[in-house]
């Protein structure tokens, strides 16, 4: 936690899901909350590769994401500050079918369901996962939901994250060893509501506010990218 404090608070650098959520979990526990560290599988519908999104969008990666469960008024809530622009921007109750507005106009929902990769002959007999989905434009006719990640209520230990972190930070197939990315949230004038984000991916910075998305900067060199971001 001390190293994370220096990186996140002092140097204002942020981090991956395991860094951000470990730091937040430590802060919440220091305030007296009951917090459980958990793990998730990111949906391949979130893949940066178009062919993967097209052909494997109904499947998930292995355990590669961290989130928290916090007990509030005897009810468990999911808390996650490590999924970038697609993550929830508020705690969500573990209630099957829960839906709410996230960063407008986007909506999020939570479902308790089996994922498509279960080996159960009857999908209803498969292990149920909590599934976090997003709907980008709910006003455009029937809602289309895109899976973001699935997770369980099983407590993950530091040694579990050691394995997860080793893979995500060293394996050549990992997103984090192939791409540079960073996200900053954009607040409204009162600094109360998140209205969008600035996201650097590879050499391009894009700004998203509401349903409007535009390229605001494109870097030509690594030095330019470091200075500009």
Name every feature range the model reports, one short phrase each.
Residues 1, 157-159, 221:
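Intrinsic-disorder/low-complexity, polar/charged segments
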Residues 1-2, 32-38, 145-150:
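Generic detector of short, locally flexible boundary/turn motifs and exposed helical patches
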Residues 1-12:
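Secondary-structure boundary elements
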Residues 7, 185, 228-229:
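Residues that form generic nucleotide/phosphate-binding pockets
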Residues 12-41, 68, 182:
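Cysteine-centered nucleophilic/redox motifs
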Residues 43-207:
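His-Asp-centered catalytic microenvironments across diverse enzyme cores
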Residues 209-229:
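A conserved C-terminal secondary-structure "cap"
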